[in-house]
Amino acid sequence: MNLKRKSNWNLGCSLTLVVVLAAIFFFNLWAQNLGKYTLQPGESANFTVNPRTHDVEYYSELILKKNDTNKLKLSGKKVWFEMNSDIFYGVEEQKLFRRNLSENDDEELPNNQKDIHLVKNGIVVSYQGEKVFYVTNNKSYTITITNVDDKPAHFEAQVVDR
């Protein structure tokens, strides 16, 4: 009787250990792929911006890291611009401009920027690497990223509300 009880105890401990290790493995696998996307041509992914309006100072940013030069269209904002940049992409006006804060003046630019260009209802990005876009608003809204290239696009994207 005692030997049978010990055998059941060992079996139970072994099964518990296997379940815990499997859970850790699958959690790790899930966490590694968090924020990584692959879109086929024409497919889209939506990202919700939830500003922390209850804070005195708040801002939101879209961190977009691309490993290739495939074209992705970003839509959902009226004006797009990178953090720490002075170039603004006005979607509604269909104008690019450089803001000069010291002179309180805007210089209009041609729509032929190398990595980002203006389209009808958004911007198309084709750079390789990481860029951070300022996406702060005073209410929640959705940003849509669409693959407008003819091949699958692999990227990492994350909206951070601070």
Name each model feature, range by range.
Residues 2-162:
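Acidic, Ser/Thr/Pro
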